[in-house]
Regions:
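Extracellular and secretory-pathway beta-repeat/beta-biased strand scaffolds
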Residues: 2-833
Length: 833
């Protein structure tokens, strides 16, 4: 009785287990009997697969189950001249492969199981050709013949066309690769050491390793195809049996997903690795709806030979995410296409709607050898978000998008095209650290670009978009095209140089606005747009052999926008747009075209040099220029007074309808030993206190200040006389005089014909003429009353304003018309009684 009950319990357990864990095959391989495939095993671990159906140089096998146990093997004992082995699994159970798959010769192996495929930690390959693991329903050939895993009893394969395609089902199974994970020894400034690289799923050089299924996950999985291709394609459900054509490319294959309307998800976690590096580096292509590379995983193509490398492409129709935006960060997560020899590197391309770079993750396009790198191109139709990582709010790790050259080769260009671009604790860098020129950076965002340097409560870190030279090569340029550009709290856009190579240019085209804003009190950071030649820090001087004082020239900054706003904070560093040279070279030019420019709280537009010629500043403003609260526009040369500084200061040219300088704001063009350069302001209205505009030199010749009224015509102006006229013939006798009084006249117009006349509005510019023939009004009395006439000033309402000597706004009154006549009486004659 007890045995009967135990047997019932056991039977129930088996039934329940089969319901709870469906479609997981046991570790075995068996033929389904539809083809002449034979499977033999002496120990239940190692399986010998023979026979099958041969058509020309293609071999077909059919299995009801196909799973390889741990430390076991599946050996396809094919003839050496077989080109392709097609293996289907028809039993409806997932293939669980945790051992070795072998084949003879150079045959390509296709493993087809619509139910799904799982590779374990011990899975490995020993085949001479390419390997395809797919959850497609069938392989369809060009002549219409189909090798189906869902309808295995179709007509026999008598003749086939060599060009196959994968017929995907409406709900393809998933593919998972579990593995030990691999953390390579590499960084932003160093190539990856692959000498102790582990292996899992690996094909011979030049071949293709492809996973084509529903959702595809690599959890520590290692995929390697030296000089070949890694193709991962996640095909989603509801595709109406879409076809994926396969095209031979060299010894590998290319997949065409143009007929697939719905894609699945691809995820790399737990230090997963995709690697096509080697003496001939290959290509990597990931395609899905969402693609995630995180948890210290790496996608790597590193060219170590003389042939050119292939491209790295991540195409996610919805989202591509590199790194993880959580407390753990992803500082060892990389997507990299590198070259360390004479062969050129490939391109790194990301195509998606939304691209995210999180947690200190890195996109690299570096060259360490003579070979030129490719280009980095990010196309995200909706948004690009790059956010760094601060594990303890003390230290920070920026998310990095880098193109670096350490050799004679030019660094690769970086281009981002999107609708909205947002950066926080993240860097976009194109640098040269060798003899080659730096790469160019182009940011295209239809709507807006927002760059935030520091985050409140987090110490350290910043955000920069930087093209720089730390060697002999010239730095690259930065170009920004958007509607609105916003930089805040230590964010920077710059082209820099620290050695012999010149700094590049910075060009900003923002149709609506450019805003630079500092809100955090932090004396180490400044929000800025700059072209700078700086002095290298000691560690850079040691690493790259740099001189303590550079000889490079600064580049030019050009900004075109409707509204430019630069604002610091009363307790913070000052936001600024600057061209600066701390070495022996010259400063670059700074050109801004805008409708309005507003500077506040110590904001500055500046050009300065240590020794060379100062750069010019040109502001072409349609409406108004306003400087408030100690803001400045300066052009300086020879900032180090102890050095032999002979550079002249740069010119400042301002064209604006209105110019306002308030609350201690200044416009200066100064030099040390060189000459102070000129300041030219053309405006209809200029408001500011005395001495707010200077052009000087410490030891050289001061510059000139020219303030022109845009409405004053230059035609007809003549030179004024320098000598006084004969006053006896210019003023009629009879003028009243008092003690210590004097009256001088110079010029050619602007006074009445005789002292009895009155100056009215229409007569202000009357000519001076000889009055020797005019009669005398009457003699002046010998005595007079020296007491001034007391007239009580009327009290009237204020109806106008002026800027007083302190620079403050003061309300004043204009008198009525009857009183105005007395105010306008410009005569020194005595009235007749």
């Amino acid at each position: 009785m007890n045995q009967t009950i135990q047997r019932c319990y056991l039977l129930c357990y088996v039934l329940v287990s089969s319901l709870l864990i469906p479609n997981i095959a046991t570790a075995q391989i068996s033929s389904d009997g539809t083809l002449s495939t034979t499977v033999n095993s002496d120990d239940g671990l190692n399986f010998l697969i023979e026979s099958g159906v041969r058509t020309n140089d293609h071999l077909f096998h059919s299995f009801s189950e196909f799973s390889v146990p741990s430390n076991g093997s599946a050996f396809f004992n094919n003839a050496g001249d077989i080109v392709n082995i097609f293996s289907r699994v028809t039993g409806g159970n997932i293939s669980n492969i945790d051992g070795l798959i072998r084949a003879n010769g150079n045959a390509n192996l296709f493993l087809i199981n619509p139910a799904g495929i799982i590779f374990g930690n011990n899975a490995s390959l020993a085949i001479g050709g390419s390997f395809f693991a797919t959850t497609a329903e069938s392989v369809v050939f060009g002549n219409g013949m189909e090798f189906s895993a869902t309808e295995p009893n179709q007509a026999p394969l008598l003749t086939i066309n060599i060009t196959p395609g994968l017929q995907m089902g409406t709900n393809p199974g998933n593919i998972t690769v579990n593995g030990p994970g691999e953390t390579l020894n590499g960084s932003i400034f160093r190539s990856f050491d692959r000498s102790n690289l582990g292996s899992q799923l690996q094909v011979e050089p030049g071949n293709t390793l492809a996973l084509v299924g529903g959702d595809i996950s690599l959890r520590g999985g290692l995929l390697s195809a030296e000089g070949g291709q890694i193709e991962i394609a996640a095909v989603g459900s509801n595709n109406s049996r879409a076809m994926v054509p396969l095209t031979p490319v060299g010894s590998g294959w290319d997949l065409d997903l143009s007929q697939v309307s719905n894609l699945g998800n691809i995820q790399l976690t737990q230090s997963a690795l995709l690697d096509t590096s080697g003496d001939t580096a290959g290509s990597i292509r990931l395609r899905g709806a969402t693609i995630t590379v995180g948890d210290n995983s790496i996608v790597l193509t590193q060219n170590e030979g003389s042939q050119n490398a292939g491209n790295t492409i991540l195409h996610g129709t919805e989202t591509v995410t590199i790194g993880e935006n959580d407390a753990n960060g992803s500082i060892n997560t990389f997507v990299a296409n590198l070259t360390r020899s004479s062969g050129d590197g490939g391109d790194l391309e990301i195509i998606t709607k939304n691209f995210n770079l999180f947690g200190g993750a890195n996109l690299l396009l570096n060259t360490f050898g003579e070979g030129a790198p490719g280009k980095m191109n990010i196309i995200a139709s909706e948004s690009v978000d790059m956010i760094g990582f601060s594990p303890d709010n003390q230290s920070t790790f920026t998310s990095n998008l880098n193109s670096l050259t350490f050799s004679k080769a030019k660094a690769g260009d970086i281009t981002i095209s999107t609708n909205q671009l947002r950066l926080a604790l993240a860097d976009i860098v194109g640098w040269t650290l060798g003899e080659g020129d730096g790469g160019n950076i182009t940011l295209n965002a239809r709507e807006s670009i927002e760059i935030v340097g520091l985050i409140s409560g987090v110490n350290g870190g910043d955000t920069v978009v930087s093209a720089a030279s730390l060697g002999k090569g010239n730095g690259g340029s930065v170009k920004v095209n958007t509607a609105r550009l916003w930089l805040q709290d230590g964010a920077g856009i710059g082209a820099s140089a620290f050695g012999k190579g010149d700094a590049g240019t910075v060009t900003i085209n923002a149709s609506e606005s450019v805003t630079l804003l500092d809100t955090l009190a932090n004396r180490f950071t400044t929000t800025n747009i700059s072209s700078r030649v700086g002095r290298p820090i000691p560690i850079f001087r040691t690493l790259f052999g740099l001189d303590p004082i550079p000889t490079a020239n600064a580049g030019e900054i050009t900004i075109n926008t409707s509204e430019l706003t630069i604002s610091g904070d009363p307790d913070s560093q000052d936001a600024q747009i600057r061209v600066r040279n701390e070495g022996f070279g010259d400063g670059g030019e700074l050109v801004i075209k805008a409708d309005t420019i507003n500077l506040n709280y110590g904001a500055s537009i500046a050009s300065s040099t240590f020794s060379g010629q100062g750069g010019d500043i040109t502001l072409d403003i349609k409406n108004s220029l306003r400087l408030r609260n100690r803001s400045t526009i300066t052009a300086e040369a020879g900032t180090d007074q102890e050095a032999d500084n002979n550079g002249d200061g740069g010119n400042i040219t301002i064209n604006s309808n209105l110019v306002t300088l308030m609350e201690g704001s200044l416009i200066n063009a100064n030099a040390n030993q060189g000459n102070g350069e000129n300041i030219s302001i053309t405006t209809q209205r200029l408001f500011g206190r005395d001495r707010a505009i200077t052009a000087s030199s410490e030891f050289g010749v001061d510059g000139e200040i020219s303030i022109n009224n845009a409405d004053t015509p230059a035609n007809g102006l003549i030179e004024l006389p320098t000598e006084l006229r004969d006053r006896t013939q210019e003023i009629a006798k009879g003028c009243r005089w008092t003690d210590t009084s004097s009256f001088y006249i110079t010029g050619r117009g602007g006074i009445p014909q005789d002292p009895s006349a009155m100056v009215r509005g229409g007569q202000i510019l009357s000519d001076v003429r000889d009055i020797s023939d005019l009669s005398i009004v009457r003699a002046i009395p010998e005595t007079f009353d020296s007491k001034p006439e007391k007239t009580k000033a009327p009290i009237v309402e204020a109806n106008a304003w002026i800027i007083n000597e302190q620079g403050n706004l003061e309300l004043v009154a204009v008198v009525n018309s009857s009183q105005a006549l007395d105010f306008l009486r410009a005569t020194c004659a005595i009235k007749e009684d």
